Amino acid sequence: MTVRGAALAPDPASPTTAAASPSISVIPEGSPTAMEQPVFLMTTAAQAISGFFVWTALLITCHQIYMHLRCYSCPNEQRYIVRILFIVPIYAFDSWLSLLFFTNDQYYVYFGTVRDCYEALVIYNFLSLCYEYLGGESSIMSEIRGKPIESSCMYGTCCLWGKTYSIGFLRFCKQATLQFCVVKPLMAVSTVVLQAFGKYRDGDFDVTSGYLYVTIIYNISVSLALYALFLFYFATRELLSPYSPVLKFFMVKSVIFLSFWQGMLLAILEKCGAIPKIHSARVSVGEGTVAAGYQDFIICVEMFFAALALRHAFTYKVYADKRVDAQGRCAPMKSISSSLKETMNPHDIVQDAIHNFSPAYQQYTQQSTLEPGPTWRGGAHGLSRSHSLSGARDNEKTLLLSSDDEF
């Protein structure tokens, strides 16, 4: 039996007893109270709704990835596209698992770590895809080199007044995205370590908590990466116009940046007391973890709409058309497993990091060139200039640039 502090109605027949008796109430143990009622995140309805959106998004995106691998006619572009598309399964499934286990801080942190690490790769791969669309660094520089940077407070280029586009500008864009690929995994590992030592709790901005410092470093890093991505788009938006970059850019930036601002908004609501903690005989969850649980639920729903938008933004149909030549014959394709293996190989990311952080970068840059090959039937929409002749073989040549051309 549990004793609660609610008043018990006095017995009219026993005034003396009523006056002497304390104001208590006896409630059978296990009876529900206001604090023990499960919040929406703990209900079967929340798990079912989020699960429906997640598994639908998985089916849509996995089919799209399969079709890209099946029509793997332009590996240099589709490698980046498939990596970008994987953000939906990873974000959706990880968020769903985090939601299912959000009352357990250990599981919750691990699932969120995997999701956050892949976020960094998506920004880098989208920038690399834009490079590939335009034919490589040298082709981009031949178009924009020496042009003055338009100063605009709206577009965040007011601090670049008087500067011109140079090879240093491209280097900054790549380095700013690559640093996020390093910082984000380091912050994820730090989160796991701090969690193990009891020094990390979601939403705890105390100076003795690791959450404050991880959040500051992460926010600076992701803001720099997204700023560099925007600067590159601002400089090459006219060159990218044949490839419908607006929807692609919007989707990649919204998936990553929207989740970031959602987390910030939920953290503010938590500090304002709008998100209560869960405390019952069975489980006790802090306000920060509850806020993160709500964000996981929102992401589960959002990934369904992201899957639909990404299916349109990165269509496989243009690559399917490139499989067929003028005589209607299909060009031989790699197996799906070998195409997936090539896509998931991080060798190009490592080489690009070495190339962009090398002291010799200001003297050399690489340009993809093609040897003439048979022309296949199909539109050029979504394909890079350097790949307008499908079936050609990629070669790398080095182009010497002036060493004093800095951004």
Curated annotation (Swiss-Prot):
Swiss-Prot/TrEMBL keywords: Membrane, Phosphoprotein, Transmembrane, Transmembrane helix
Pfam families documented for this protein: Solute_trans_a
Main subcellular location of this protein, as a coarse class: membrane
Region (Disordered): 1-24, 369-395
Disulfide bond listed as a keyword: no
Subcellular location(s) of the protein: Membrane
Cystine connections: none
Positions bearing Phosphoserine: 388, 402-403
GO MF term (any one): transmembrane transporter activity
SMART domains named in the record: Solute_trans_a
GO cellular component terms, semicolon-separated: membrane
InterPro entries: Ostalpha/TMEM184C
Similarity remark: Belongs to the TMEM184 family.
Function summary: May activate the MAP kinase signaling pathway.
Protein name (database record): Transmembrane protein 184B
Annotated organism of origin: Bos taurus (Bovine)
